[in-house]
Amino acid sequence: MSFSDCVIKSEYRSLIDNVVQDFYLPILHEAVSYKRAVGFFSSSALAEISKGICDMASNGGKIQIVASPYLSEEDVKAIQEGYQNRETYIKKKVLKQIQDEDVSNDYYTLERLNLLTKLIEDGILDIKLAYTENNGGIGMYHEKMGLMEDSSGNIVAFSGSMNESATAMEVNYETIDVFCSW
């Protein structure tokens, strides 16, 4: 199956659609690449879309995130630990951990920092921080867009108000516009 076999709307609104269930999970299930640029990133987003990430990792997929440096202290530590330990862990360990069908979503929420660390350790996730040059010190990188690619080379691009956090995915009123390459 490829993206072209999925039902993809041209717009998702969080008060109408379940963006995680209706957009992220089906697309990540088919994806081999997920590139995201956001103003704010939180490991809570990984917990929300962990099933899709697991599917993508099983496809040999990779995630690349560019975000502003406004991260929680916990996420900074998890990211640092992930990069420090990247070479010492085997990819199958993280796949086994997040593939367990008997594990509840509460586990993912509780283990979000461990998930962030493991995805980085295993080379599945890379995070880069974007800084802006400004005169007053008040500007920040705040773009919000994403690209996902499947094994057939089909691309789904999206942009809108949504950051990469559980709050954006589950609580806020957010809109994304979606564009398909086919």
Q: Predicted segment positions?
A:
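PLD/PLD-like phosphodiesterase catalytic module centered on the HKD motif
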Residues: 1-182
